[in-house]
């Protein structure tokens, strides 16, 4: 984990991505965020992007998951949320390629 944390500290951009289950990010991503605690005070001056997908047709579950991510961002110095890409109403594998979220991700990528 120290190697990964050192790469995060040295990076200019962070991108977190997660499917949304039960109005939250996955346990794997949450565990990863929690494991950054050992060096969280060295994670600073970054642009941050969040990518999420949800079966929920509304934005409610995405908004709830985003609150967890924003909690992490409030604890690190000068990490700026630059973009969010999310897809809703995605129930089956491959559906995202037909949604607007893929276009959003492509446009956002141009600015990274």
Language-model features, listed with the residues they occupy:
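Glycine-rich phosphate/pyrophosphate-binding loop and the adjoining helix
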Residues: 70-112
């Amino acid at each position: 984990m120290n190697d990964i944390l050192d790469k995060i500290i040295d990076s200019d951009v962070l991108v977190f991505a997660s499917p949304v289950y039960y109005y939250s990010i996955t346990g794997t991503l949450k565990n990863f965020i929690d494991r950054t605690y050992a060096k969280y005070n060295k994670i600073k001056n970054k642009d941050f992007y969040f990518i999420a997908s949800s079966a929920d047709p509304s934005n409610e579950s995405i908004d709830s998951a985003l609150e967890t991510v924003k909690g992490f961002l409030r604890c690190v110095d000068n990490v700026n949320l630059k973009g969010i890409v999310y897809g809703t109403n995605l129930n089956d594998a491959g559906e995202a390629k037909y949604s607007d979220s893929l276009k959003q991700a492509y446009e956002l990528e141009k600015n990274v």
